[in-house]
């Protein structure tokens, strides 16, 4: 697990003077980058191997938004690797240690030279220590279709 502390800045607020969704995502992405850098499998490691992690999915649950000057702790850890995908939880806590935001994310590792997904290297898998999934309601990723729908004419997709 990796954590860091910060203070909510004016530039991170939305019009209601709460931490904006974009800033929450920035904190979480920075946290995962700091984590990877600390483990020696960060940006330079990936670049040398023509690899990149691509965000595939976010689920963010906000119980309470931090406000201007609130002291916060941001944390992250992976909980699973499957094929070319990495599964990672994030959280944000207030200065009392209460978890006010939780998130689930799925990342895809891409090989930039081959132009396709790649499995994490053995070194990457060893560097990250998976922890138990964060307790939260995990939303399904598939969209359920309701009703019968209607038949449409076929068409060809080209370049």
Regions found by a protein language model. Give the residues of each.
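Generic short beta-strand
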Residues: 10, 89-92, 107
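Hydrophobic beta-sheet segments that form the core/acyl-binding groove
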Residues: 59-95
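Residue-level signal for glycine
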Residues: 97-99
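GNAT/GCN5-related N-acetyltransferase fold signature
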Residues: 60, 105-107
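Hot-dog-fold acyl-thioester-processing enzymes
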Residues: 1-55, 102-104, 111-159
């Amino acid at each position: 697990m990796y954590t860091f502390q910060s203070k909510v800045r004016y530039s991170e607020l939305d019009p209601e003077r709460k931490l904006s969704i974009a800033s929450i995502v920035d904190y979480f992405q920075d946290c995962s980058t700091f984590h990877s850098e600390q483990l020696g499998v960060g940006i330079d490691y990936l670049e040398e191997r023509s690899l990149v992690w691509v965000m595939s999915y976010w689920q963010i649950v906000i119980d309470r938004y931090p406000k201007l000057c609130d002291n916060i702790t941001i944390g992250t850890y992976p909980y699973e690797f499957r094929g070319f995908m990495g599964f990672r939880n994030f959280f944000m806590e207030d200065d009392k240690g209460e978890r006010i935001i939780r998130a689930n994310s799925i990342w895809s590792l891409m090989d930039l030279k081959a132009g396709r997904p790649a499995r994490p290297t053995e070194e990457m898998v060893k560097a990250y220590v998976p922890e138990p999934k964060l307790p939260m309601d995990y939303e399904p990723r598939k969209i359920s279709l309701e009703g019968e729908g209607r038949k449409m004419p076929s068409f060809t997709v080209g370049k």
